[in-house]
């Protein structure tokens, strides 16, 4: 067994494990950690606990520190910078005449990289755009093309149930959803009834799948 904490970097983002060392870290704390992207500010969603060794990707990186007041202030400043970066990138996309839709801008905590998330129908040659952005921000630039489900997860919204979208609220990862699940639950197969804001089958169809499968088994038993 390995002692870990679970950390998220975005709302309903994937949970990553880190070594808590001897620090007293609890759920809701903010921590500074090193990731493949650089130094980042994360929120603890699972306090110190043990998990099976095969659930941990080695080497398990240690927490650098529990975020202090200065760290929290810097993170807030980064959020403001992201708004400006988004605006500038959108202007540059128009300037270069690229058929891409900008979704979000994100600074790493140490400002060593700015990531821009976008959607597009096909592949985009954004090499000149990257050069232009690098000359403005004087740091590393990464453009990442995402799908419609990821776009909805980032932006959020309200589902047809009247509640905040599952993918933006609590789902860490997308799960496979099939039309078979809607059929087993006797739902209307009208696309407008079983599709989410993203236009894909609603993630919540998966929530009751197991219950319906068990019910069908009991009904079919003599």
Model-derived regions: residue spans:
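Acidic-enriched and Gly/Ser
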Residues: 1-188
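Ferredoxin-type iron-sulfur electron-transfer modules in oxidoreductases and energy-metabolism complexes
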Residues: 171-191, 195-202, 206-216
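Residue-level detector of conserved catalytic or cofactor/ligand-binding positions
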Residues: 217-222
């Amino acid at each position: 067994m390995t002692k870990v904490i679970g950390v998220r970097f975005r709302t309903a983002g994937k949970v990553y494990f880190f070594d808590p060392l001897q620090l007293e870290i609890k759920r809701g704390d903010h921590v500074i950690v090193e990731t493949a992207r650089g130094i980042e500010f994360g929120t603890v969603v699972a306090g110190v606990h043990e998990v099976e060794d095969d659930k941990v990707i080695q080497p398990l990186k240690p927490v650098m520190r529990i975020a202090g007041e200065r760290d929290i202030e810097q993170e807030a400043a980064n959020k403001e910078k992201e708004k400006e970066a988004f605006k500038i990138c959108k202007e540059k996309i128009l300037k270069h005449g690229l058929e891409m839709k900008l979704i979000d801008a994100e600074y790493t905590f140490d400002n060593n990289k700015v990531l821009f998330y976008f959607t597009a129908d096909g592949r985009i040659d954004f090499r000149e755009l990257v050069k232009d952005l690098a000359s403005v921000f004087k740091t590393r630039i990464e453009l990442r093309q995402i799908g419609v489900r990821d776009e909805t997860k980032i932006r959020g919204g309200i589902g047809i149930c009247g509640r905040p979208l599952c993918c933006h609220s609590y789902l860490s990862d997308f799960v496979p959803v099939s039309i078979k699940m809607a059929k087993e639950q006797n739902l209307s197969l009208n696309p407008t009834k079983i599709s989410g804001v993203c236009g894909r089958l609603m993630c919540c169809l998966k929530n009751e799948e197991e219950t319906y499968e068990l019910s069908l088994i009991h009904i079919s038993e003599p």
